[in-house]
Amino acid sequence: MRKLDQRGVGAMEFCLVAVPLFILMFAIFDLGRYAITMQSLRTLANAGARAIMINCYTNAAIQKTTPACSGDPLPSDAAKQAVAPFLYNGGLTPTLNVPATVTSPLTVTASQPNFTMLMPIWGTALNAPSASTSIPF
């Protein structure tokens, strides 16, 4: 029996192993990017809630009235970037808002509207993440 030529077997085995390896590696990078974005959004929502507590809720509690706070609790981009600098990578800008009608609990929502996942395997399920913090009063 004649022995077959073994040239190129290593390259073929590398191709079989490299494709799943690189897909897994980029999926891990993409999920890590999503996780740090979600953590930064939670941090930004918490900072907005603290700003509401200090600037609006404290005055309403002293005057014994219902707080009437709406809009962006951290109106400048510099204040938001100081709290969560990762959200500004790639030219993205997060939004932070409070509903116009005050109900208990007061909810502060931070979102990243133009965020998209790099890997197409996720679809659109993880695009435009948002996080919120509720303040009971």
At which residue positions do the language-model features occur?
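N-terminal leader/signal peptides at the extreme start of proteins
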Residues: 1-7
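N-terminal signal-anchor/signal peptide hydrophobic helix marking the start
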Residues: 7-20
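Aliphatic-rich helix starts adjacent to a transmembrane/signal segment
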Residues: 10, 25-55
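Preference for short coil/turn "hinge" residues that link or interrupt alpha-helices
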Residues: 22-24, 29, 111-112, 119
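Short, conserved structural patches
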Residues: 38, 46-137
